[in-house]
A protein has these predicted regions:
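Short glycine/proline- and aromatic-enriched beta-strand/turn motifs that initiate or cap beta-hairpins
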Residues: 19-67, 202-247, 363
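Transmembrane beta-strands of outer-membrane beta-barrel pores
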Residues: 32-38, 61-63, 82-88, 117-123, ...
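Membrane-embedded beta-strand positions of outer-membrane beta-barrel proteins
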Residues: 28-32, 78-80, 113-117, 147-149, ...
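Residue-level signature of outer-membrane beta-barrel architecture
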Residues: 61-63, 104-106, 151-155, 194-196, ...
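Repeated loop/turn-to-beta-strand initiation elements of outer-membrane beta-barrel proteins
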Residues: 66-68, 109-111, 155-162, 198-201, ...
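Outer-membrane beta-barrel translocator/channel fold
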Residues: 26-45, 66-72, 92, 107-160, ...
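Outer-membrane beta-barrel "beta-signal"
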Residues: 57, 184-203, 353-364
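Solvent-exposed loop/turn segments connecting transmembrane beta-strands
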Residues: 48-51, 86-95, 230-237, 250-252, ...
Length: 364
């Protein structure tokens, strides 16, 4: 009941805030959700004690084809979201998250897919004295991603509409600090949407999408950050990655990549030493090299000045065994002009995250 009361108060405030004359081409939506924590790792079984619930409050800006990319992606929305989640376990605590998101439309704009990325705050992370059972979250600040698939109807009652659907919310600190088994919530959501304007603007349908390609371009990127092995208390260490790759633009929205990564992962120095003295049966001498080299192929999906980058790699130089020879990378890239870019990416081995990477680069 308290979630519905909170939701009503928030929505009432938004209605009062939205009483303006000029067109804003935006709307608010408010969803209540309830679901289950997915058992992706048996180690978190003791943390699953109830059905998590919470609210998702969002502001959304509509697009009407004023720019070519808006028409190519069927007039998506973009906006910001706030998520409050009660994980129904005192050990886990509660999460508060702030996200940027896109909404993509299908089936005559009745079906929406939202993808959001942001930062969440956990109220009760791991502490070796006060909260040693919380092996899901090793830090207050978490990386969080959520996806929402809704059947939505707008303007059913004046400016009010309804939506119902499914949500997936992921929380992890990406091995910035151990422990980090993470939490995934699968939930059913339902809620209201409210359009600020009395009526929508007209859609532009003047796209002349001629074939577009570019010659092969060459990229150099530098990525860095901090991470830790799975050994609690082993310490956080900086890492550095140099990447060189070629890309071929296939269309306005798509490009393919082929390149090489060189990894300088300082946390492996500590892990190599730890295994050499603690687990002699694993035949680790302590002199193994902490560096790795990988070859990768990738794809880039362009959305305005942003892009979604996905890569699959294989270590060709792999002197110390850590999580297997294949790796993946997914993240967001932002272009500044035609040559320079910044990126935030997640590197993982299957479902096991290794690091959040912050990168800069040049394309020539």
């Amino acid at each position: 009941m308290k979630y519905w009361l909170t939701s009503f108060i928030i929505l009432l405030g938004l209605l009062l805030f939205s009483q303006e004359k000029r067109a804003s081409d935006s709307y608010f939506d408010l969803n209540y959700f309830s679901g289950n924590i997915a058992l992706h790792n048996n180690d978190i079984l003791h943390l699953i004690t109830g059905h998590p619930e919470g609210i998702i409050l969002s502001w959304n800006k509509k697009t009407f084809g004023n720019e070519a990319w808006e028409q190519r992606f069927n007039y998506p929305d973009y906006g910001v979201s706030f998520i409050y989640q009660d994980l129904k376990n005192n050990v886990l605590g509660n999460n508060y998250g702030l996200y940027a998101h896109y909404n993509f439309y299908f089936l005559k704009r009745n079906l929406t897919l939202r993808v959001g990325q942001g930062i969440a705050y956990n109220t009760n992370p791991y502490d070796k004295l006060e909260n040693h059972k919380n092996i899901a979250f090793g830090t207050h600040l978490l990386s969080s991603t959520y996806a929402m698939l809704n059947y939505k109807k707008e303007r059913l009652f004046d400016r009010f509409g309804l939506q119902i659907g499914l949500s997936l919310i992921h929380y992890s600190n990406a091995n910035v600090k151990a422990p980090n088994t993470s939490v995934n919530t699968m939930a059913l959501n339902m809620g209201l949407n409210y359009n600020i304007d009395e009526e929508d603007s007209e859609y532009n349908e003047n796209l002349n999408d001629d074939k577009f390609t570019e010659r092969i371009k060459y990229n150099i990127a530098f990525r860095s950050g901090f991470n830790q092995s799975d050994i609690i208390g082993s310490g956080q260490f900086p890492f550095y990655i140099l990447s060189a790759y070629a890309d071929k633009r296939l269309s306005h929205v798509s490009a393919i990549q082929l390149g090489v990564d060189v990894f300088f992962s300082n946390f492996l120095k500590e892990l190599i030493y730890y295994q050499s003295v603690s687990f002699p049966e694993e035949n680790v001498s302590g002199d193994e090299d902490y560096k790795r080299v990988g070859l990768f192929a990738g794809h880039e999906l362009f959305i305005n000045k942003m892009s979604i980058e996905t890569q699959l790699g294989y270590y060709i130089y792999y002197p110390f065994d850590f999580e297997g020879r294949t790796y993946m990378r997914i993240g967001l890239k932002r272009y500044f002009g035609n040559k320079f870019f910044g990126a935030i990416t997640l590197k993982s081995h299957g479902a096991k995250a290794e690091a959040v990477e912050f990168g800069i680069g040049v394309r020539i």
